[in-house]
Structures are given as structure tokens and as C-alpha cells.
């Protein structure tokens, strides 16, 4: 027997070196060995759900929580109906909801999946901003460490306050991270013990002490990233506030809504675990509250059924195969030329659409430029084998590397 827990989790996808999905490898191994495999999840991946719908997989459901605890209620807080004060991200309604729970001795979690203090730093006098010298991305300001950090290559820099125009820089910190939300929470609840729960704070030696304090309700308010959704049991946590649901539901990733569904169901599962009434609040500026209502509904099948219809209509995975081809190199012009030549080479020889080439959303990563091609075709080994044979024959320019990602999960 093979058991794959949290089968939907993106961490099963190895996206460096040899690229593969460990869940799919486990399914293949079970098939080769003719042994059963159990895929366990609160919200299945869209591929698994489609296999359930067409009867390829059988399904067993647990329709009750442990000890018959009720599922948390979900409420949407529409920020279009309120005016936030300058440089704040929590509405008065949100603060009032949190205060109601704190009065009942409930723990409160403010959730924002963004590390650090601010994702973008700009001087409003000289207009200089801090970007990573190795990647085409902003450096994130970590206030506690007084450090600017690239979350992709690890580059670190200090905040230079000397202005190229005159005197000292007058910084604008654009957008919040968990450190900034923590400061705002402390201003609103000065007498409460507040703790940040992220990979920056929980990988230290004292993390077990922090966990014990949370369990014993010595920490009343948590400000956390996605790390907090990973299977922790906090008996007093009965209020979760998602600071910005728009951050995860929008963007260039076709799986953004699916990933949000999985994340927020996992996150909601942290609340109300001991039977007390619990609520998850979602702050949003989006006027399309239908999609948010589906994502936050306790029945994930509502969203998954609609998502499958959209994917089928538009011939998107799991109804077609995507194969991502990422070309990387230090010479931008040579890379662009190779990408166009390679596309022409492929188009003449395979029975599939080749989209691109386009610059990757993160165009430069670890000092190398990145260009993407995307192959859309039938789900067949014949297509994969023919692409593999063509790649083996093709001669790229010196310094150009090709990475092949079958069934990509991320499109960065």
C-alpha cells in the first residue's frame, strides 16, 4: 500500500534538477507493482477530481470533523464599502470582529502569505528602488533584520539611506508583509501578545517554545504566512482573518484559483478544532464575490465542478497536456534568437501548438535570462516521446540551457 498525504500539495513537484511530481511517480509505481494507492486530501487537485468524476478513482469521504466539531463559518469583508486610513490594511469592521473573539478568550490569526515588512521600497525624492542585481524582482525589506532580501536567490543588502538627489532618502514602503501587519495589529491591540508565524521566525531553536505558548493561549494573536496552514493544532484558534484574498486569487497562473481553494480550506481547518464556533473572514477589493464565495465555501466540489467545466471548454489541463520549455542563458540576444529558431524547429515536426516564445514572468533569475515556450497537445506518450527525440537532435548555442517541465504547476 502507498499513501500520499495532502496529494494536492505543490511541494510534491520537484522543479529543479530532474523535474517530476512525486505524487504522479507514486501513482505510476503503484500501477507497475499492481498495489493499491490512497491519495489523501481535504481538497483534491483538479487532476485527481477529474479522475474521480470519470470513475477512474474511487472515493471515500469524511463528512464530519474530529469529535464532530463544526466547520468554521466564512464571511467576506468588502473593502470597497469602507475607507482605510493611509498605510493601513485592516478595516474597522475587521478590527471589531477580531476584538469580539478576543473578548471571548479566542485566539486570532491574521493571515498574509508574504514574508518580511514590505515587498517594494522606493525613495520619493530620487525615485530609486531596490531591485535584486541577480533577478528581475524587487528586494523585500525585512525590518527586524534591517535587511533587503531576494526570496529567489538569497541576495542580501542593507538599506542605503544616502539619497542621490540630496541628504537622506525619504522611503516609501509599498505594500505589506507579515511584519508590517504585525505592527498594525499591535497598534490596535496594544495589550495583547502578538507573534509572527513564518519561515523567518519558526526555523529557530526556540520554535518549539513558541508552539507551546500558542497551544497554551499565552500568545493571543498570530500573524502568519502559509506555513501556519500546515497541519498544526491550535485548540484556542477560533478566528482567522485573511488580510488580502486578492493577493492569491489573481495573476498569470491558470491554477491560481485552484491553489487558493486548497490553501484556504487547509487554513480554515486550523480554526474551531475543539468544537467552539469559529469564523474565517476574507478581506477583498474584488467585485467578483462569486468566485470568492466558491473558494471559501465549505464544500469544495462547487468550485471544482465549475472549474472543470471552464478547463474543458478552453482545452486546459487536465483535458490537454501542457509542456513548458524554459530556455535560460546569460546572453539575452542569443537566448531570444535560439528561442525563435527552436520554436520553428518544433512547429514543423510535432502535432501540437507551440506558444511563445515569451519572457518568463521572472525574466532574470540567478543572473540568467529566461524565455518560455508552451506546448499544448493531447495527453499521449507519443507527443512526449517525439518532443524528447527532437530535443536530443537539436543543437543549442553555447551557454543556453533547456529545462522541460511536463504538467507545470508554476508559471514563474
Each model region followed by its residue ranges:
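Inter-lobe coupling/hinge segments of SF2-like helicase ATPases
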Residues: 1-336, 344, 371-374, 381, ...
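A structural preference for short, hydrophobic beta-strand core positions in alpha/beta folds
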Residues: 39, 194-197, 354-357, 404-406
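Short amphipathic beta-strand starts and helix->beta connectors
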Residues: 303-313, 348-361
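A common structural junction motif
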Residues: 343-352, 390-400
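Nucleotide-binding motor/catalytic cores of P-loop/tubulin-like NTPases across gene-expression machines
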Residues: 351, 366-369
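Short proline/glycine- and acidic-rich turn/helix-capping motifs at secondary-structure junctions
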Residues: 356-366, 402-412
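Short, charged interaction patches at domain edges and termini
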Residues: 374-386, 409-411
